[in-house]
């Protein structure tokens, strides 16, 4: 059984900063007195200025009014836990949200929380991620306040062999969350990439701790390129962002709220009805589901073939070009064949 939740994590955003940010953001059109701020965030009136200065040091523009109070000049695009929790009520993801302004890897933090017994639905967020992990040991970096680095901890009652479906669930949720932000229809490349114009803007990494017959917990890491104005030269031909594609800035907070709502919906659909509705939806929105010529790279070989749907566990089936039959791809890199 899960133990008591971890209350404070080293490096996590102080709850008073979170409360102050939420208070100012939700009352951005009025001046709030120092006395009210002190009462709301649980500090003395003498300490209010210090916390305002801490917020300013994080890049939040707060204007002071002598003998009147403070107001926020422009609501910042920060993934503040209190703002998220209020908008996520009724979902599994509203109660335990750990926020970091800078972290190495949200997946690593979530794995530690899973081992410590943290409850299903725990969310870990980072404004900047310096050592995020992608599949096959690749690095996924998140530029400060430009992307979304989000990991959720789940404890589904499913066998380990069905864990690939969790990645599909996350991919569908992410696609639904960003579809209206893009001028072109996004695609899902099995199992974990979201593309637009064949360039990647989102990656998903699912990791788990399992016993032979049961999955103890899984962490689903989702990284989205949102407001990057350009990509590094070495990946600019294969990667993109919502801003690059749309030509405008996007609210990371609103995208994340939609993402977690959709994730809650798809996750509950999967638990209630099994794999069938997830596979049907994937078939509707992914060009990689069937009939796509692909190049497969696994630790033991490379080959080309044509996709032939998914098995009930979420594994991809590929008819090989070399005549060796149909291969079930549990893991490996999938790319569109030239």
Name each model feature, range by range.
Residues 2-44, 53, 57, 158-164, ...:
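Long, positively charged amphipathic alpha-helical accessory segments at protein N-termini or as interdomain linkers
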Residues 101, 188-190:
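Short loop/edge segments at beta-strand edges and connector loops
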Residues 2-179, 202, 250:
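N-terminal lobe of the biotin/lipoate ligase/transferase fold
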Residues 63-66, 189, 310:
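Short, ordered beta-strand-loop transition motifs
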């Amino acid at each position: 059984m899960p133990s008591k939740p971890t209350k404070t994590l080293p490096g996590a955003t102080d709850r008073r900063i979170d409360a102050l940010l939420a208070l100012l953001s939700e009352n951005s059109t009025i001046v709030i007195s120092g006395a009210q701020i002190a009462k709301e965030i649980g500090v003395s009136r003498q300490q209010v200025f210090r916390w305002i200065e801490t917020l300013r040091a994080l890049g939040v523009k707060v204007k002071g009014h002598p003998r009147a109070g403070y107001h926020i000049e422009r609501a910042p695009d920060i993934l503040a836990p209190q703002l998220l929790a209020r908008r996520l009520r009724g979902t599994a993801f509203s109660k335990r949200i750990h926020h970091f302004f800078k972290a190495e890897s949200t997946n690593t933090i979530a794995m530690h929380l899973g081992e410590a017994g943290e409850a299903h639905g725990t969310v870990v967020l980072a404004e900047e991620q310096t050592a995020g992990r992608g599949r096959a040991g690749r690095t996924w970096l998140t530029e400060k306040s430009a992307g979304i680095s989000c990991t959720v901890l789940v404890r589904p009652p499913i066998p380990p062999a069905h864990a690939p479906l969790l990645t599909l669930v996350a991919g569908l949720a992410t696609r639904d969350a960003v579809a209206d932000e893009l001028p072109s229809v996004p695609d899902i490349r099995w199992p974990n990439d979201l593309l637009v114009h064949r360039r990647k803007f989102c990656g998903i990494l699912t990791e788990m701790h399992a016993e032979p017959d049961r999955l103890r917990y899984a962490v689903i890491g989702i990284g989205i390129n949102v407001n990057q104005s350009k990509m590094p030269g070495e990946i600019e031909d294969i990667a993109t962002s919502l801003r690059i594609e749309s030509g405008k800035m996007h609210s990371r907070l609103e995208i994340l709220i939609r993402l977690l709502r959709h994730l809650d919906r798809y996750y509950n659909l999967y638990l209630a009805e099994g794999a069938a509705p997830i596979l049907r939806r994937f078939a509707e929105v992914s060009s990689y589901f069937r009939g796509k010529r692909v190049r497969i790279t696994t630790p033991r070989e490379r080959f080309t073939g044509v996709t032939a749907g998914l098995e009930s566990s979420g594994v991809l089936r590929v008819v090989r070009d070399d005549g060796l039959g149909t291969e079930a791809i549990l893991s490996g890199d999938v790319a569109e064949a030239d």
